[in-house]
Structure formats: structure tokens, C-alpha cells
């Protein structure tokens, strides 16, 4: 959404906390992460445990009468709305606009006559039907729907899995931008009508064509102060997650064409390179954060927990400039870390990179089976960590293939250590292969011989981060101090 000279964006965050990241840009190219609209996910107790692939689906970001609005669908609970006068927050608690199973991908529209509407899709896994779009009238304050709505588009015959609709009014037409065909191999469809409830005409306005940008999937249309039109959308890049693309929009005869029509078939293809948007000026390069020196009183905005966090999991000591993770017990009957809530993770920032961290491990003297270290997490995972055992401290490397199905870890390396301070490293290649290594002095690193092919998460890419877990119950915990978390690319 654009407000004046400023652009704002949010995205699906599923089950992680904090959720609904808020990004700000001056030119649609350089984006700064400025906060999150959802510090905790509701219902709180439900999301105190990892709910992979659930939670926040396909939000819409809007600005209306001096306030910012975010609408999102939770497929298990319904359609929620949050609002704020400042996009940095504070944001209101999520308000349930419509309760129901399988209600997803909402997008509001405030019309010129003061009436309001909401378009949404359905998740077949909960609703028992998909590939349809519904428009309902909404109270102008955005808090609830005034009717059950009407099906305005049926994609079953030619546009299966149409979803992620975004609602606009432009030059007398109601437009719904919506991808169809699925995340991996879909295309962008646009619907238009002079009447909010239809009938709607439709046209395919962008597809993969001869490019290597598969999808292209959900996104939003925005204009610049200079009158240009652009479309931001995501591409499913497997283990690297859903990466963002920017494409030009050109209008002809009341229809948008997104990207460039290279073969004159009337359908745009995503651009790999293009001039930047003309926003009336130039702006400095800005990128979302990744490295963290832990020299602030708060975690960097790039970090997210696997579930709603407890305030006893982490402490940043600005005097010592380190992050302390206290161990917390593994969930009952956990066969691996897939359902562990207290994993501190962040997205992959590039196709190839190296992460370094320095850790001092101080486990409890009660021999609780504590383990702390570095992890790459997805539907499978690999970790390099220090672990306390009955006969001392060990450096261990473990992999859980098919962790999502309960597969136990396999130990590929274990070495007894004479020190509790260790430098841990992982490097990711362009092909998505991770190698782990360690050092006791920060200069000479020993590589773990077993490489790990990175596996994506549930509708997200793989993540990298830190953890501290224990096997047993006690009245206190040990801890691990991390001096930094540094990326090099």
C-alpha cells in the first residue's frame, strides 16, 4: 500500500512469533523491516505450540481515513483485522471479523459511497471447497460482515485454486487481482466488473512464460506519486522460501498487463531486470537485517520463534553484549525438534551465505541432557551443538530427515570437548547444500564430513538460528551465551 511518498508491505507469517512483518520503502526496491503487527498469535494457547503451515495466511494491507488496516485469514478460526495509526505500531489486538473454517485471503474495499466490501477465498482442506471467490458487504468500520456474501468467480473449469484475491476500484471498475493454478506453477488472473457483485470478466495478465520465475503468485498492485503502476508478488523458491519480485504494470483498454509481453500473446512475463520505479527521487540502499551483535536490549526484528514465546526463553545483556538462551524442556513425547516452540530462527537472506556464532555453554549441574547450538530448520533439520552427558561435554552433529513425520535424529558426529566455548559455522551453497564446521579458537575450523541438503519448511523456506533444549524437568535451567550471529555473503 502507498501512503503519500511511503510504501508499506506485509506478508504471510503462518505460525511464527512475532508475525505479520511490516516493511517500509521509499522506492519499492529498498525495503526496511520496521516492526511486526502481531507480537503474539491468537488464540494464545493454541499458538503456544508450533502449528506448521497454519496461522496467518495471505494478509492485505490497506489505508483508510487515517488508519492502517491488515486483514488476514486463519484457516482454522476465521478472518481477522488489526489496525494502527502508525505502521510501526502499536497495532490493535486481532479482531475476529468473521468466524469460520477455511475462510482465507481476505481483502477489503471501501467504496466512494461509504459502503465497504470484503473479498475472500476458501481453503479446501478446511472448507471442503476451493477455487471460488466470494464478495460480502462489510460494515464501514471494518469490524464485521453485513451478509454472507456471493460467489463472484468459479475457477473450477479453467482457473483451479484461484486464491489470494486483492480488491481495487479503478476508473469505474471493480478489479480483483488473484493468482490461480497453485503456488508453484500458477499465473495471475484479473477480474473486472462495473458491479461489485459481478458479473466479472476475467483475463490472464501474467504467467511464467519463457522465464525461470515460476508461479508467479500472490501480490499487490500499487502506484507511485509520479503515476507509474507496479505489481509486487512472490515466487516459490523452495528451500529459499517465497521471494519477492517487482514488475511493471501497463494498462490498455481497461486491463492491466503485468511484466513484459515478449511474444505478443497478450500475457505478461516477469522481468528479471528492469529500471527502477520513478518515485520522483533517489533513495539509499536498504535491506532487511540479518546479522546481530546482541548489543541492544531487544532481539533484532529479523528473529522469530517457532511459536508464541515465553519471556523466560531469552535474555539480552547489553552490558555483556550477548544473547542468553535458557534451556527449556522438550515437549512430551517429542521425537525430534519439529514441535519444539523455543527455536529462535530467521529467514535465509541469500542463495549462498555463511553464518558464524560464538557460544559459551553453561548447562545445569543436574545433568538434564541439555543441548545448545546452531540449527538449520525445515521439514527436516540439521544441528551442530554442545550437549552435556553423564561423562562430560560433547560436540554433536545431528540430522532428522522427515522431521515433520516424527523421524528421530541420527547422530553423525560426536566428540568429547575440553572447553565449553565454541565457534560454530554453517555455509550454504547455491545448490542449497549446507556444511557445518567448528573451532575452539575462532581461527582454525574443522569441517563436519556429512553435508546436509537443506529442506524447506511448511509453505516457507528453511530457516537458520539458535536453540537450547533439555530432556528433563527441573526447577531451574542451564544457559548458553551467544556473542554474535554474523552472516557473510
Tell where the protein language model's regions lie, with residue ranges.
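Carbohydrate-active catalytic/glycan-binding domains of CAZyme proteins
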Residues: 1-489
Amino acid at each position: 500500500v502507498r501512503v503519500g511518498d511511503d510504501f508499506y508491505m506485509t506478508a504471510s507469517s503462518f505460525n511464527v512469533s512475532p508475525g505479520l512483518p511490516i516493511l517500509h520503502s521509499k522506492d519499492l526496491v529498498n525495503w526496511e523491516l520496521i516492526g511486526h503487527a502481531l507480537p503474539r498469535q491468537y488464540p494464545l494457547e493454541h499458538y503456544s505450540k508450533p502449528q506448521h503451515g497454519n496461522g496467518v495466511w495471505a494478509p492485505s494491507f490497506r489505508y483508510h481515513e487515517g488508519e492502517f488496516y491488515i486483514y488476514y485469514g486463519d484457516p482454522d478460526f476465521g478472518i481477522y483485522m488489526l489496525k494502527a495509526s502508525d505502521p510501526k505500531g502499536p497495532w490493535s489486538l486481532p479482531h475476529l471479523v468473521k468466524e469460520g473454517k477455511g475462510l482465507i485471503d481476505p481483502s477489503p474495499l471501501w467504496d466512494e459511497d461509504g459502503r465497504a466490501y470484503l473479498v475472500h477465498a476458501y481453503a479446501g482442506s478446511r472448507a471442503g471447497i476451493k477455487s471460488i471467490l466470494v464478495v460480502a458487504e462489510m460494515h464501514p468500520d471494518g469490524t464485521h460482515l453485513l451478509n454472507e456474501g456471493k460467489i463472484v468467480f468459479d475457477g473450477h473449469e479453467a482457473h483451479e485454486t484461484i486464491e489470494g484475491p486483492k480488491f481495487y476500484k479503478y476508473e469505474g471498475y471493480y478489479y480483483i487481482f488473484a493468482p490461480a493454478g497453485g503456488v508453484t506453477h500458477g499465473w495471475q488472473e484479473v477480474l473486472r466488473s462495473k458491479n461489485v457483485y459481478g458479473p466479472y470478466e476475467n483475463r490472464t495478465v501474467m504467467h511464467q512464460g519463457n522465464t525461470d520465475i515460476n508461479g508467479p503468485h500472490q501480490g499487490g498492485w500499487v502506484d507511485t506519486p509520479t503515476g507509474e503502476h507496479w505489481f509486487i508478488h512472490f515466487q516459490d523458491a523452495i528451500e529459499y522460501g517465497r521471494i519477492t519480485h517487482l514488475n511493471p504494470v501497463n494498462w490498455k483498454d481497461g486491463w492491466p498487463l503485468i511484466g513484459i509481453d515478449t511474444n505478443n500473446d497478450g500475457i505478461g512475463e516477469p522481468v528479471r531486470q528492469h529500471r527502477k520505479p520513478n518515485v520522483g527521487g533517489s533513495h539509499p540502499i536498504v535491506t532487511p537485517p540479518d546479522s546481530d551483535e546482541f548489543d541492544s536490549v531487544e532481539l533484532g526484528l529479523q528473529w522469530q520463534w517457532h511459536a508464541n514465546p515465553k519471556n523466560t526463553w531469552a535474555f539480552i545483556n547489553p552490558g555483556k553484549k550477548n544473547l542468553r538462551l535458557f534451556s527449556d524442556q522438550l515437549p512430551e513425547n517429542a521425537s525430534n525438534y519439529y514441535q519444539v516452540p523455543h527455536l529462535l530462527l530467521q529467514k535465509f537472506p541469500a542463495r549462498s551465505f555463511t553464518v558464524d556464532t560464538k557460544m559459551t555453554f553453561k548447562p545445569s549441574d543436574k545433568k538434564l541432557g541439555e543441548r545448545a547450538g546452531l540449527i538449520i530448520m525445515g521439514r527436516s533439520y540439521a544441528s551442530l551443538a554442545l550437549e552435556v552427558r553423564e561423562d562430560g561435554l560433547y560436540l554433536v552433529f545431528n540430522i532428522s530427515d522427515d522431521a515433520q513425520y516424527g523421524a528421530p535424529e541420527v547422530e553423525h558426529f560426536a566428540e568429547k570437548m575440553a572447553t565449553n566455548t565454541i565457534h560454530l559455522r554453517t555455509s550454504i551453497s547455491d545448490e542449497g547444500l549446507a556444511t557445518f564446521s567448528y573451532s575452539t579458537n575462532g581461527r582454525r575450523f574443522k569441517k563436519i564430513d556429512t553435508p546436509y541438503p537443506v529442506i524447506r519448511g511448511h509453505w516457507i523456506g528453511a530457516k537458520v538460528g539458535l536453540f537450547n533444549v533439555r530432556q528433563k524437568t527441573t526447577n531451574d535451567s542451564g544457559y548458553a551465551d551467544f556473542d554474535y550471529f554474523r552472516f557473510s555473503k
